[in-house]
């Protein structure tokens, strides 16, 4: 009887080990898919991330400064800097949307320049002329934004800095708002951000494939995916979720979102507004 019990226990441990190994393998595949999946097709958006003709033409025409800074891991980041002529120690960092580049921010730059701000339009990692082969979804964006803040502070130690992001850039701004370094920013504007990376993935994959089994599979794989994320990047999903991170924010926050937005539901903005920790916030 003891031998049978030992055999059963051994088989159970073996099965559990195989299950964990299979889960770990699948979780790592899910991690790779986060970065390499054709999100432009899944989300139904155009891919202009490497089309730099417009921004280069405007830099040449108006004499905007093309700038390069290294991030903490050595990745080269690229941006365009437009200095205000009135030296009022105010600047804004503009962050573009998914599969776009800093050229998307030009209309917003005009608004801030009229208000007397110096403007820094940057290419997010994996976009434009910045290093990286794919969207980063916030894994390194706090460090990347630190590099840009350091760039502005080196120009003017008294610089008061705000961050305005659109779509993916809005999500990155919200992640930064909850960081220790982000507390020093004077304001944040989040235009059309998603609230939860996992919820965004669930909704868009369901719409893209029409197969609810994949959504169920995401839930089953979630612990293994998070393990892979931690092994690779020392991050968990909560570190990449604007809803979670903006709850720590203390700087003034303006959330913008169109009620007819078909890419990111307006409810995401309502959730973000409800949970944001900023004492001064508007939707």
What is the meaning of each model-derived region?
Residues 178-235, 244:
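Hydrolase active-site cap/lid region
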Residues 3-8, 13-70:
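An N-terminal hydrophobic leader/cap segment in hydrolases
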Residues 274-283:
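Catalytic histidine neighborhood in serine/cysteine hydrolases
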Residues 111-131:
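Conserved alpha/beta-hydrolase
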Residues 248-250, 255-257, 261:
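Short beta-strand/loop motif that positions the catalytic acidic residue
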Residues 98-111:
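The serine-hydrolase catalytic nucleophile loop
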Residues 262-268:
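Conserved alpha/beta-hydrolase "acid-adjacent" motif
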């Amino acid at each position: 009887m003891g031998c049978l019990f030992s055999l059963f226990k051994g088989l159970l441990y073996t099965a559990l080990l195989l299950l964990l190994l299979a889960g770990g393998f699948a979780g790592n595949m899910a991690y790779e898919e986060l970065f390499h999946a054709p999100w432009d097709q899944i989300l139904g958006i155009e891919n202009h991330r490497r089309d730099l003709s417009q921004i280069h033409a405007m830099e040449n025409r108006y004499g905007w400064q093309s700038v390069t800074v290294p991030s903490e891991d050595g990745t080269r980041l690229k941006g365009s800097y437009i200095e205000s002529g009135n030296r009022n120690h105010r600047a804004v960092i503009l962050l573009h949307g998914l599969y776009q580049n800093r050229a998307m921010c030009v209309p917003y730059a005009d608004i801030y320049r009229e208000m007397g701000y110096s403007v820094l339009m940057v290419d997010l990692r994996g976009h434009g002329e910045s290093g990286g082969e794919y969207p980063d979804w916030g894994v390194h964006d706090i460090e990347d934004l630190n590099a840009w803040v350091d760039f502005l502070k080196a120009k003017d130690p008294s610089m008061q800095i705000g961050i305005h992001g659109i779509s993916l850039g809005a999500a990155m701004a919200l992640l930064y708002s909850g960081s220790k370094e982000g507390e020093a920013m004077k304001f944040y504007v989040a235009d059309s951000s998603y609230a939860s990376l996992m919820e965004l993935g669930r909704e868009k994959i369901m719409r893209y494939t029409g197969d609810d089994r994949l959504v169920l599979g995401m839930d089953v794989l979630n612990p293994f995916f998070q393990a892979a994320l931690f092994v690779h990047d020392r991050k968990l999903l909560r570190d990449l979720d604007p809803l979670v991170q903006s709850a720590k924010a203390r700087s003034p926050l303006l959330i913008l979102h169109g009620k007819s937005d078909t890419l990111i539901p307006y409810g995401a903005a309502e959730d973000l507004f409800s949970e944001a920790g900023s004492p001064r916030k508007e939707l």
